[in-house]
Amino acid sequence: MWAIAGLISVLLAQAAAFDCSAKELEHYNFELLKGIHSVTSLKDTPPSQTNLTWYFGICEPIKEGLDACPQNSDVCGITSIILKGDSKNRVISEIVSFNTNLQKTYEPFSDSEIDSTGIAISYTGATWGDNSINAALRFVCPPKNNEHILDKFKLDSWDGKKLKASMYSKAACITSDKDKLKPPPKKPDNGESWGWFTWIFIFLVLFLSIYIVGGAWFQYNKGNAIDFSSALREVLDNFVELLKGIPAFSREIIEKFTSNSNRGEYSAV
């Protein structure tokens, strides 16, 4: 019973994740960003350094095992203390998580100051210790004269209560269905891959090899040849005779068809 309840809760959490097929995102192309993104802030705090890394799951939740993030997080922040000269050993001091089942709001915006539009996704209802925390992710459609790095998160602020992060991406531009993510075009074949003719040739060679060797072995086992080499020579001779007869056979077939067509023309007259 408990196992079934746990499975249901996991499925519900995944269903509520940052879903690229959500109705509010149907005019955008967030499939371009599908995956786990991160942004890191490093602060010098002698005699140590404080590393704050935020992870963002776009169109899929963050799985357990990524750093110290809890399972099924949409957004996860990990703060760790690193002693100078000992970067391998670190102490995790803070873990902040916005779970997939939190309430999310999607709000399109238009910013005249940067001459651009986009959509903001907000998380509410999360807790971190005794604190209630929220998150606002702002996805901006890059303007014409864009100087920002695309598809990279920027940590705008984190004060222990609200996370603000932003990203400039074409995924945040209103897109028609026909312009949405399409599979990348196939690279032209520059002779690096084998064509169908090559495969036919290979199979033909294999078939002939099996036919010749198998036929020789059959002749030898039946006692029709003194030794295997004689049997092989006999099969090869028969095969050569067969090849010589192919042109005459083809000519006979062609003549038969052409003569039939001529008879049809005469009868029509």
From Swiss-Prot:
Main location: membrane
GO cellular component: cytoplasmic vesicle membrane; Golgi membrane; mitochondrial membrane; phagophore assembly site membrane
Signal peptide span: 1-17
Organism for this UniProt entry: Scheffersomyces stipitis (strain ATCC 58785 / CBS 6054 / NBRC 10063 / NRRL Y-11545)
Gene name, Swiss-Prot/TrEMBL: ATG27
Cell compartments where the protein resides: Cytoplasmic vesicle membrane; Golgi apparatus membrane; Mitochondrion membrane; Preautophagosomal structure membrane
Any one biological process term the GO annotation gives: autophagy
Record keywords: Autophagy, Cytoplasmic vesicle, Disulfide bond, Golgi apparatus, Membrane, Mitochondrion, Protein transport, Signal, Transmembrane, Transmembrane helix, Transport
The protein's name: Autophagy-related protein 27
Gene3D superfamilies referenced in this protein's UniProt entry, alphabetically: Mannose-6-phosphate receptor binding domain
The family this protein is said to belong to: Belongs to the ATG27 family.
Topology in membrane: Single-pass type I membrane protein; Single-pass membrane protein
Residues that span the membrane, as ranges: 194-214
Cytoplasmic topological segments: 215-269
Keyword Coiled coil among UniProt keywords: no
